Amino acid sequence: MAAQKRKTTKRRVRKNIPSGIAHIHTTFNNTIVTITDPAGNAISWSSAGALGIKGSRKSTPFAAQLTSEAAAKGAMDNGMARVEVYVKGPGPGREAAIRSLQAAGLEITAIKDVTPVPHNGCRPPKRPRN
């Protein structure tokens, strides 16, 4: 019998990054929070779908709150204390996600809205009828 070869897997290295950038991307259907170092390398991320929230509940402010809490926890495990917040998109979870980052223990130094605004580009989707 041949000797079994052990698989070597890379361990996640705990980085000590004091400040970073929180990118909050809110759409009408989901919220994605990515926390990066100042160079733009992802430290931690989370989304409503990744947390197991399904369907129309992904687009709620509560889902955005849980998402940013999970991302903030991962960032704080890597020694992060201060973040700049970049918010992109028109979704319902914008304010909830920012409030949740602060409640999780991260100090927010600046908030920027980086939502792309078209110079009358593509035709938008039809208005939903309730």
Curated annotation (Swiss-Prot):
Signal peptide: none annotated. Coiled coil: none annotated. Gene3D superfamilies: Ribosomal protein S11. GO terms for molecular function: rRNA binding; structural constituent of ribosome. It holds the Pfam family Ribosomal_S11. One of its GO terms (cellular component) is ribonucleoprotein complex. It comes from the Bacteria. GO terms for biological process: translation. PROSITE patterns: RIBOSOMAL_S11 (PS00054). Keywords: Ribonucleoprotein, Ribosomal protein, RNA-binding, rRNA-binding. Part of the 30S ribosomal subunit. Interacts with proteins S7 and S18. Binds to IF-3. Belongs to the universal ribosomal protein uS11 family. Located on the platform of the 30S subunit, it bridges several disparate RNA helices of the 16S rRNA. Forms part of the Shine-Dalgarno cleft in the 70S ribosome. NCBIfam families: PRK05309.1, uS11_bact. This is Small ribosomal subunit protein uS11. It comes from Acholeplasma laidlawii (strain PG-8A).
